[in-house]
Amino acid sequence: DYINLSRHTSSLGYGVAGTYFIIKDLQAKLSYEKAYRLPTTDELFGDEDLEAGKTNLRPEQSDNVNFNLSYGRQFGKHGLYLEGSVIYRDTKDYIKRGLDAIGGMSYGIYENHGRVKTKGFNISLRYNYDRWFNIGGTFNNINARDDERYRAGNTLQESVSYGQRIPNQPYTFANFDANFAWHDLFREGNTLTIGYDGYYQHEFPLYWEALGDPTTKSRVPDQLSHNLVLGYSIKNGRYSFSLECRNFTNEKLYDNFSLQKAGRAFYGKFKVH
């Protein structure tokens, strides 16, 4: 048996954005938005595996400000692209992911947290040489902290997590890649590609940092993974195949549960267009 439940809510979201070229190749962007985020199906109902749903979640509402600078220019066969952004978010009813034990098993759970303020930045850099080679990467730092000063239901007692970093989510991470293409190899219209990409993620806490002994706290450790892919296409991409090795150094990688992911893995693909 089941019970039909329904909920109705309505909110007005809006935004405004502007852009200006400071010089020919240097562009500035500024935007503001009043945003609402509805809970996802996994957040509401779980995934029947490691996520436990919560049907009474409220939508997030936030005031977001973004400022971006980008510069891109070609110098003959050489291309350069730089981009930097800063963000500010003031979020109410923040949907926070945590961990809970249900029936002796640990599950991911979601709950609304009164208020969270987020400040962050990202920097991207990319260089390319003609059609042959490109290399680049992105660095991100997202500082989301509890801004709910007093405990829920108590207007006098200050929350021990006030001002603390939101747990169980990465806050410093980067990705980088390099790609080489050899056009018209063996025959016109055929291309050999060799690609590398990597990902770095700084350690982060599973629970509030203010709670418990700092020397015994559960943390998801630093992670650094490397992937390689070799591909060859024929007749301008009509036929193509690729071989890929993911995590080729066989590093220990973890998800937000601190559960270990699969190690070194190999994949092959063949396509006909």
Language model feature labels by segment:
Residues 1-23, 38, 143:
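Signature of Gram-negative outer-membrane beta-barrel scaffolds
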Residues 1-2, 41-48, 94-102, 142, ...:
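Outer-membrane beta-barrel translocator domains and adjoining extracellular loop/strand segments
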Residues 10, 18-21, 34, 59, ...:
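Residue-level signature of outer-membrane beta-barrel architecture
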Residues 12-16, 28, 53, 63-67, ...:
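Hydrophobic, lipid-facing positions within transmembrane beta-strands of outer-membrane proteins
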Residues 21, 27-31, 59-119, 140, ...:
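Membrane-embedded beta-barrel scaffold of Gram-negative outer-membrane proteins
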Residues 36, 92, 199-212, 216-225, ...:
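C-terminal beta-signal and adjacent terminal beta-strands/loops
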Residues 79-90, 111-205, 249, 271:
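Gram-negative outer-membrane beta-barrel transporters
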